Structures are given as structure tokens and as C-alpha cells.
Amino acid sequence: MKILVTGFDPFGDDKINPAIEAVKRLPDEIAGAQIVKLEIPTKFNVSADVVKDAIAKEKPDYVLSIGQAGGRFELTPERVAINLDDGRIQDNAGYQPLNHTIHGDDENAYFTQLPIKAMAKAIREAGVPSAVSNTAGTYVCNHIFYQVQYMRDKMFPDIKAGFMHIPFLPEQVVTRPETPALSLDDDVLGITAAIKAIVSRDGKGDIETIEGKDH
């Protein structure tokens, strides 16, 4: 089994992004699966091409994209990607789409193929906070989540794909009072646990456990 794991470069006012820092520290093999690590740019109109080229070259069984979610205190496997770009800030190319559809002729939303409940449970059992999330936002994280699902639907039907957000690092919240943070070691531990869950649930689907939310 081969798993492509992507992480974004820094964006906005931050000089570091825990996503790519954690991805770079992952081992090359987890639970018998080969781990291919890829840095992608925080740019709406570029990131998808970088991932598409990597999928075509590596032919992974799974794609797990990792992104930063400042303000969250846990690792959050994402349930659904929506067909919308609505940038809170400009991306790293200076582009800020507002209420743009990603693909005008396609699905309003795609659901992940990853066992997100099993992933969240495995992360917590590793001692790292985690919960399933039902919104990946409308910035480049949701964009790449949707784009990879679109690629799966149109070009790479054999892959399974999804997205997971991770919190700020401690050094990112020095001037952000009361903002949650998680250490890089915990990020790596949590992502590793999530990947182990993906491998263990391959061909079995997700587990049946309560992860729903009222809002």
C-alpha cells in the first residue's frame, strides 16, 4: 500500500505551517504502508496541479492532505468538501476568490472515503485530542480537499482520499492569547495514528461510533 501525504507551506502572517512540518517528520513507512510526502503551495490555482502530478507519478492507494486550522485544539479528520472558494485572506499568490465555485459543472460536495471515525478514535487512543469535523472551511484546505475528490471522480477512480486539519504550534500563539496549540511531536503522533487507522480499515469501511455534532 502507498499513501501520499501532503502538507501546505506557510501562509498569511505565519512563518511556519505545522502541516508541512509534521508531514516532513513522518516515517517513510507506517504499518507496512509506504509514505510519500509532498509539500504543496497555499495557492488556489496551483496546489491541485501539484497534487495531480504526484498522483499520476506515484499512483497511491490513498491521499491524505494535512492543513493548519488555527483556533482548533484537536486534530480533525474532515467529513466533506464543498464546491466553494471564499478566501478569508489572499493566498500566497495574492489571489482572494469570493463566492467562487471550484468546478461549475460538478457536485456541490464530496464526502471523504477515509475512515474518519476510526482515525479520530485512534488519534485519541494515542493520547492526542481529536474529533471528526463537518467543515473544512472555504480556503485552500477545502479547495484541495474538493479538488482531489474531483480528480478521484474524473481521473483517478482507484484512490481514496481525505483531509485532516491540525492546530497551531506553540510558537505560533505567542502573540495570540488564549489560542489553542499542539506540539509538533503530538501532531506527528496523531497523524501517524490516523494513518495506522487508514491501513487497518482498508477494505472494511469506517467504524460505527458516535462522532456527530448538534452544530
Curated annotation (Swiss-Prot):
Pfam families: Peptidase_C15
Source taxon at top rank: Bacteria
This protein's record includes keyword Protease: yes
CDD domains membership: Peptidase_C15
Keyword Cytoplasm tagged: yes
One GO term of the biological process aspect: proteolysis
Stored SUPFAM superfamilies: Pyrrolidone carboxyl peptidase (pyroglutamate aminopeptidase)
Subcellular location: Cytoplasm
Entry's Gene Ontology cellular component terms: cytosol
A GO molecular-function descriptor: pyroglutamyl-peptidase activity
Reaction(s) catalysed by this chain's protein: Release of an N-terminal pyroglutamyl group from a polypeptide, the second amino acid generally not being Pro
Record-listed E.C. numbers: 3.4.19.3
Keywords: Cytoplasm, Hydrolase, Protease, Thiol protease
Enzyme class name: hydrolase
Active-site residues, as the UniProt record annotates them: E78, C141, H165
Primary residence: cytoplasm
Function summary: Removes 5-oxoproline from various penultimate amino acid residues except L-proline.
Quaternary context: Homotetramer.
Family, as annotated: Belongs to the peptidase C15 family.
Listed name of the protein: Pyrrolidone-carboxylate peptidase
Species name: Lactococcus lactis subsp. cremoris (strain MG1363)
Taxonomic path: Bacteria, Bacillati, Bacillota, Bacilli, Lactobacillales
Gene name as annotated: pcp
